[in-house]
Regions:
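Positively charged n-region of N-terminal signal peptides that target proteins for export
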Residues: 1-6
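Electrostatic cytochrome c docking/interface patches
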Residues: 15-31, 42, 46-51, 104, ...
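The canonical Cys-X-X-Cys-His
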Residues: 35-42, 96
Length: 108
């Protein structure tokens, strides 16, 4: 009985982790429009001195946002990115990564 209970806990834990880490693309797009679009442009296409961030792997986007959230400087706009990333939760980072992975800018 203990083994069955243990396996159930492990299974639900794994499912929870995957559901959180998968990210919600729609929520990510909303958060992107709220916090990121002014510098990185429509669908993360990049603008002026701000890099293109769309089409990157989820692991890359997640790692970069977590690095900035932790206050670590990486590039020329690090102070701004640190300020923008510090309030992000793990779920918001996963959502942003899910959105940006497949975001495509379409010319109007």
């Amino acid at each position: 009985m203990r083994t069955l209970r243990f396996l159930a806990v492990v299974l639900f834990s794994v499912l929870f982790v995957f559901s959180v880490s998968a990210g919600d693309r729609v929520a990510g797009e909303a958060r992107y429009k709220q916090s990121c679009i002014n510098c990185h442009g429509m669908a993360g296409k990049g603008a002026a001195s701000y890099p293109k961030i769309s089409g990157k792997e989820v692991s890359y986007i997640t790692a970069m946002l977590e690095t900035y959230r932790d206050g670590i400087e990486v590039g020329p706009n690090s102070s701004l990115m640190i300020m923008m990333a510090q309030p992000l939760t793990d779920v918001e980072i996963a959502n942003l990564a899910a959105y940006l992975k497949d975001a495509v800018y379409q010319q109007p």
